[in-house]
Amino acid sequence: MTSTSNGEPRSYWHATAPPPVPSAALPDACDVVVIGGGQVGTWTAYWLARAGADVTLIERTAISWGATGRNGGFVSAGLADGFTATAVRIGEEGAWGVWRISEQGREIVQQIIAEEGIDCDYRENGTVGLILGEDELDVKHASVNELASHGVAIEALDRASLQELIRTPLADEIAGGVFHPQNALVHSAKYLAGVGAAAQRHGARFCQANVTELQSDGDGTLVVTEQGTVRARNVVVGINAWTDELVPELTGLIVPVRGQILSYEPIPTTFTTGVGVAVTPTGEYWQQALDGSIVIGGCRDDAPNKDVGVRETVPTPDVISRIADVIPRLFPQLNGLKVARSWAGLMAFTADYLPVAGPAPGLPGVWVAGGFCGHGMPFGPRLGQLFTEAITTGSTPDALRPLSADRPTLTPVVSTVFEAVE
């Protein structure tokens, strides 16, 4: 089956995923309601359940149905706009603080997959960024040296070293690369379904329902859904591209951006690492799954307004056609790849390329996270821990301060096109 009942294309991850986590009836009340079955929501429910909270995770479709189940499957530490640009905006201390959240999240993924026995094709094979043209080589390798001096696991690769990682000849335009040996790859839907199942084992309740409104009510919040209302002392909103539906004060500050992806029919193992490149200004990325399929996305540069502000999750022929040209251009012997399916998903971006994570403005007792700029995979696990700490202690952890909704660099998105950050 290549599409859902409403005609929305199914991703490779969804098509090869286990059955959805079963849904329970909505309770009348609980300690915490978590809204959204993506990275933030599922991990927050997991950590709260482990801490002994009575937690209900509400998702309108299924766990990993949004961005997570439509992405490239990378668990990569780092910052969407890079360290240098982020440090200019918020200072080096703040930039390293956010970087550490992503590194800690990556470590949590490895740890919990092992502890909970999650079968999700986890491979800590690293990711490599391709450098196109000799002019870029010195610039990129200089940034590698800066990060390495701060203890980041990163390596500069010349063309010969890069060729050792990739089992097909490189095109002449590839000059070298940047290798991140500690980054990992997963089957996105299997991975998050496994976290959700683990959360249930620890006592979390999963309910399929569509939340329509949050109402402050004394010392708690009424979570209004189409299926009923739940009273909770605390609420966590983790719906990323749809954040403004429940937290209106973030309208225009967190905006949806469509990402388009395709998968190829299986071929013999060629790419063991994740791969990123900037053939277009908005960037491309891919991994080869264990069954030999290649999942590749990017090329937003070919879409009107770079797909910023788009809420439809249907791919467009122009962008998919451009994506299909990327690998054959860079690896000439792979010019016979056959497209198996294509799909789209919604990311969420902010003007300063940093997520929002902390108290929701205008909603006492509500916490919110969103705007991950295509990098939610490493942030979700650690933010779930930090939200659990905030709810159990009643105070905001210092680690969340650079991501607060009232930071001066979080301005309305007007014309930013978010280049090369997928």
Where are these regions (language model features)?
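Glycine-rich FAD pyrophosphate-binding loop
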Residues: 50-70
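Helical element adjacent to the flavin cofactor pocket in flavoenzyme catalytic cores
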Residues: 145-148, 173-233
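Dinucleotide-binding Rossmann-like beta1-alpha1 core, especially the glycine-rich loop
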Residues: 78-161
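C-terminal catalytic lobe of FAD-dependent flavoproteins
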Residues: 325-422
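Active-site lid/adjacent beta-loop-alpha segment flanking the redox-cofactor pocket in flavoenzymes
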Residues: 268-363
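Helix-loop-beta segment of a Rossmann-like dinucleotide-binding subdomain
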Residues: 92, 119-129, 161-198, 202, ...
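Flavin-dependent oxidoreductases
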Residues: 214-295, 309, 420-422
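Extreme N-terminal leader/targeting segments of oxidoreductases
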Residues: 1-32, 419
